[in-house]
Regions:
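Glycine-/small-residue-enriched transmembrane alpha-helix faces in small-molecule transporters
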Residues: 1-41, 145-172, 192, 196, ...
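Specific transmembrane alpha-helical segments of multi-pass solute transporters/efflux pumps
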Residues: 19-26, 58-98, 104, 138-140, ...
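Membrane-interface helix termini and inter-helical loops of multi-pass transporters
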Residues: 25-36, 61-64, 93, 139-151, ...
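Cytoplasmic-side transmembrane-helix entry/capping segments in multi-pass membrane proteins
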Residues: 10-14, 67-76, 123-134, 153-156, ...
């Protein structure tokens, strides 16, 4: 009886999308006031402290240092938090929130390829066609000049690959590990990695008064948008196949993100961006309405 778990997985996926819709706009707000590396380090440190508190209350700290789990937990922390968030915040600081939103839509392509190569989920012709539509939409929305001149665009395009690689590690090495442990490890270890990188980078921080004023927003960014979103995501992929979960979450985020970008930043998408986003959303809709991925036989 898979109906009930799938319905619950869909609910977690939608909640993850709503949460994620605010990520680009808030990232643009914070990186506009402080260095991107500092924002990444402090927001993830806040998430790490929250994760430590949650795991302590649940008496689940032991798995973080268990010999059979710790290497894989460190790996997903390096990929899915430290590297991904470094690329994301650096990219967001160099582009608009709308461009950041558009770039992240490439994630289903990575999910499709990794699910096929590593998990044996063969792509159907329908999903291949959807991938072509999705990529065409992103290219149309961004335009050729963005790929040629913007380092931020390339950093943002690389970010979802880091996330998908970390998800793959979870599915291959950490099956059965509670979502709260996975999320806690990602932000504890990943936050520590980013703090260490910031400490040795010599990056200047804003004046103490300004930094203090930013801390509440950084805390929300790390704990709610970061840790909360990760918890929701792991609950979703525990009940849905990776490509399907990605294809549900990713199309909802840009539509809601455009509203968040307008509300928080006053950014308005151009007609070209709307057209590209529409094509991308249609491509992902083809993903969502298609059959679940097939697993190759041994």
């Amino acid at each position: 009886m898979r109906a009930a778990p799938e319905r619950l997985g869909l609910l977690f996926a939608v909640a993850c999308a709503v949460n994620g819709a605010f990520v680009p706009a808030v990232a643009k707000l914070t990186t506009g006031r402080a260095d991107a590396l500092l924002v990444a380090a402090l927001s993830n440190a806040c998430a790490g402290l929250a994760a430590l508190l949650v795991l302590g209350l649940r008496r689940q700290l032991a798995p973080l240092v268990a010999p059979q789990l710790a290497p894989s937990l460190l790996l997903i922390s390096a990929l899915g938090t430290a590297l991904a968030h470094l690329c994301f915040y650096l990219g967001a600081s160099r582009t608009s929130a709308i461009v950041a939103t558009l770039c992240l839509q490439v994630e289903p392509v990575y999910a499709l390829l990794l699910s096929w190569m590593a998990l044996g989920h063969r792509p159907t012709p329908r999903r291949l066609a959807a991938t072509a539509l999705l990529l065409a939409g992103i290219a149309l929305a961004l335009g050729a000049s963005a790929f040629e001149t913007s380092t931020g665009v390339w950093l943002l395009l690389f970010t979802p690959l880091c996330w998908q690689l970390s998800h793959l590690v979870v599915l291959r090495r950490l099956v059965g590990t509670p979502a709260v442990v996975l999320s806690g490890a990602r932000y504890l270890y990943g936050g520590a990695m980013l703090l260490a990188l910031w400490a040795v980078s010599g990056t200047a921080s804003p004046p103490a008064a300004e930094l203090t004023a930013m801390l509440p927003l950084l805390a929300v960014q790390g704990t709610v948008l970061g840790l909360g979103g990760t918890l929701l995501w792991y609950e979703a992929i525990a009940r849905l196949d990776l490509t399907r979960a990605t294809a549900i979450v990713v199309p909802l985020i840009p539509l809601l993100s455009l509203a968040a970008s307008f509300a928080l930043l006053g950014e308005v998408a151009t007609p070209r961006q709307w057209l590209g986003l529409g094509l991308t959303a249609f491509g992902i809709l083809v993903f969502v309405t298609g059959p679940a991925a097939e697993t190759r036989s041994a």
